[in-house]
Amino acid sequence: MSKAFSAPGKAFLAGGYLVLEPIYDAYVTALSSRMHAVITPKGTSLKESRIKISSPQFANGEWEYHISSNTEKPKEVQSRINPFLEATIFIVLAYIQPTEAFDLEIIIYSDPGYHSQEDTETKTSSNGEKTFLYHSRAITEVEKTGLGSSAGLVSVVATSLLSHFIPNVISTNKDILHNVAQIAHCYAQKKIGSGFDVATAIYGSIVYRRFQPALINDVFQVLESDPEKFPTELKKLIASNWEFKHERCTLPHGIKLLMGDVKGGSETPKLVSRVLQWKKEKPEESSVVYDQLNSANLQFMKELREMREKYDSDPETYIKELDHSIEPLTVAIKNIRKGLQALTQKSEVPIEPDVQTQLLDRCQEIPGCVGGVVPGAGGYDAIAVLVLENQVGNFKQKTLENPDYFHNVYWVDLEEQTEGVLEEKPEDYIGL
């Protein structure tokens, strides 16, 4: 019997760069653009186990893995390389150590927000519940929009595989899903990232503080030095308490998040490595900037929390006063931008480059705009803007009326969706 799952994309609103250190909090919003996986067990007449994965929205989107060992990396039969799928299968099987042969088919879908929408054809499922864009090119040739597609992919494939071997794991132990996906994502990337994107894919909108990187680093060293011990150490790590923060959160009532795609593009790893180099070379200077940024981030989170609490205790007054009570939140966002501008200037890395400063300043002039930032590591490719819900239509219209003035920003069709990984109905994907 088939099972289906989905995991959200992310918008990283506060905590860029600081999130790499386990002393700082970050604020990450889960988005309505989701990655999907439908898993179906086939017959088990095979002598060796097999996992077939397809991504029908992209050309050549098929990978077939024959599994001869639970402790070796899977090999794709046509030598097609997909490091994220390989890593996920490898970590799941090393953890589960299945003793019986299995034959699994996984079909992956991604919502339109993850990729450029040029040269696409729309397809809708038989019951009308799901609609996806089909591309004429291979996935490696289609531009991504920076919503966390690799973290979403690893999370949803890990969830579907784990759910096959451990029924109901999604409802009984999300920490297992998170820990497996986090390890697999790091293994695929060959580095221990901050992990906020995987954490958001599993848990949803969160205030996040990272785990100690040594947790995963140590188990990878075991894999290199003593591979036979790896499954045992991996099991221990996945079952352990990582002591990281993932507090559920949500944007306040009446405030909407808009994600603006700006034709540009900047490679996140290059930005991050340059900032880390500056931090190493100028510890005192960087410490001042980090403190300034952290203070602004915490103020931003405090304002959001207080607005949510105010709505919960007295919704009527909150709604009545909302238009006039956003100023402290606007100030907090401006202070985050000042911190990012200082980081840009001191490190000489284009985190909030001049063109983005200009665009965000112009958005700020439109009635109903609470404030905007360059999300995540910053750069040229996106902006995230908070707008009063009753002004969203007018806000978008203003940017469309004068596209050159607003740098031809394209508002991606998505919104906050606070839930993390979810079980879906398999019938919603029939006919795609």
From Swiss-Prot:
<comment type="function">
    <text>Phosphomevalonate kinase; part of the second module of ergosterol biosynthesis pathway that includes the middle steps of the pathway. ERG8 converts 5-phosphomevalonate to 5-diphosphomevalonate. The second module is carried out in the vacuole and involves the formation of farnesyl diphosphate, which is also an important intermediate in the biosynthesis of ubiquinone, dolichol, heme and prenylated proteins. Activity by the mevalonate kinase ERG12 first converts mevalonate into 5-phosphomevalonate.</text>
</comment>
<dbReference type="InterPro" id="IPR016005">
    <property type="entry name" value="Erg8"/>
</dbReference>
<dbReference type="GO" id="GO:0019287">
    <property type="term" value="P:isopentenyl diphosphate biosynthetic process, mevalonate pathway"/>
</dbReference>
<dbReference type="GO" id="GO:0005777">
    <property type="term" value="C:peroxisome"/>
</dbReference>
<dbReference type="Pfam" id="PF00288">
    <property type="entry name" value="GHMP_kinases_N"/>
</dbReference>
<keyword id="KW-0752">Steroid biosynthesis</keyword>
<feature type="binding site">
    <location>
        <position position="10"/>
    </location>
    <ligand>
        <name>ATP</name>
    </ligand>
</feature>
<feature type="binding site">
    <location>
        <begin position="142"/>
        <end position="148"/>
    </location>
    <ligand>
        <name>ATP</name>
    </ligand>
</feature>
<dbReference type="InterPro" id="IPR014721">
    <property type="entry name" value="Ribsml_uS5_D2-typ_fold_subgr"/>
</dbReference>
<keyword id="KW-0808">Transferase</keyword>
<keyword id="KW-0443">Lipid metabolism</keyword>
<dbReference type="InterPro" id="IPR036554">
    <property type="entry name" value="GHMP_kinase_C_sf"/>
</dbReference>
<dbReference type="InterPro" id="IPR020568">
    <property type="entry name" value="Ribosomal_Su5_D2-typ_SF"/>
</dbReference>
<dbReference type="GO" id="GO:0010142">
    <property type="term" value="P:farnesyl diphosphate biosynthetic process, mevalonate pathway"/>
</dbReference>
<dbReference type="GO" id="GO:0004631">
    <property type="term" value="F:phosphomevalonate kinase activity"/>
</dbReference>
<comment type="pathway">
    <text>Isoprenoid biosynthesis; isopentenyl diphosphate biosynthesis via mevalonate pathway; isopentenyl diphosphate from (R)-mevalonate: step 2/3.</text>
</comment>
<dbReference type="GO" id="GO:0031388">
    <property type="term" value="P:organic acid phosphorylation"/>
</dbReference>
<dbReference type="InterPro" id="IPR006204">
    <property type="entry name" value="GHMP_kinase_N_dom"/>
</dbReference>
<dbReference type="GO" id="GO:0005524">
    <property type="term" value="F:ATP binding"/>
</dbReference>
<keyword id="KW-0963">Cytoplasm</keyword>
<keyword id="KW-0418">Kinase</keyword>
<dbReference type="GO" id="GO:0006696">
    <property type="term" value="P:ergosterol biosynthetic process"/>
</dbReference>
<keyword id="KW-0067">ATP-binding</keyword>
<comment type="similarity">
    <text>Belongs to the GHMP kinase family. Mevalonate kinase subfamily.</text>
</comment>
<keyword id="KW-0547">Nucleotide-binding</keyword>
<keyword id="KW-0444">Lipid biosynthesis</keyword>
<keyword id="KW-0753">Steroid metabolism</keyword>
<dbReference type="InterPro" id="IPR035102">
    <property type="entry name" value="Phosphomevalonate_kinase"/>
</dbReference>
<protein>
    <recommendedName>
        <fullName>Phosphomevalonate kinase</fullName>
        <ecNumber>2.7.4.2</ecNumber>
    </recommendedName>
</protein>
